[in-house]
Amino acid sequence: MIEAEWWEYDSVDEMADAVAGDVGFIIESAIDARDASLLALPGGKTPLPVFSKLAAQKLAWKKVTIVPTDERLVEVSDERSNARLLAQSFMRAGARVIPIGGENADVEAAGNIADARLQDLPWPPDLVWLGMGGDGHTASIFTGPDMQNALDAPKARRAVGVQIGRAHV
């Protein structure tokens, strides 16, 4: 059974320091164990204070690979792209950020591209951080016409493209 812990902070800055410290420790531990670290991180505005503090840490960033936990069907250059946000946050530090296929407007093709890119990475990730949107969605998991197909996908799949029920941008 997983034990949940509740942590409260007096400010966003205090929370960002704590979370960045924890993620930095995960990265260092992975690099010590395997000489590499793989992170799956969310997009959106909420994690930006953490990303800023994390990217400023003196870590072996050249050994860190980051993928988005989810992506919109937009070009990487689009300001709504989670891969773009992650690249802006971490590439200057030296991390490698891999887009997962949002640049393809076809939902099924985008899912297949994402799965292929993720299959090429050492699995499992050292950290999977799921973001939560203002409307309560988590990691772009929305009810919609493809929800059951996603839930029934083969266990070997690392990504599935889904059409959401309504736009969440």
Where does each model-flagged region fall?
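Class I SAM-dependent methyltransferase SAM-binding "motif I" and its flanking Rossmann-like core
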Residues: 127, 134-166
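Generic structural signal for well-ordered alpha-helical scaffold segments
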Residues: 20-28, 51, 55-56, 87, ...
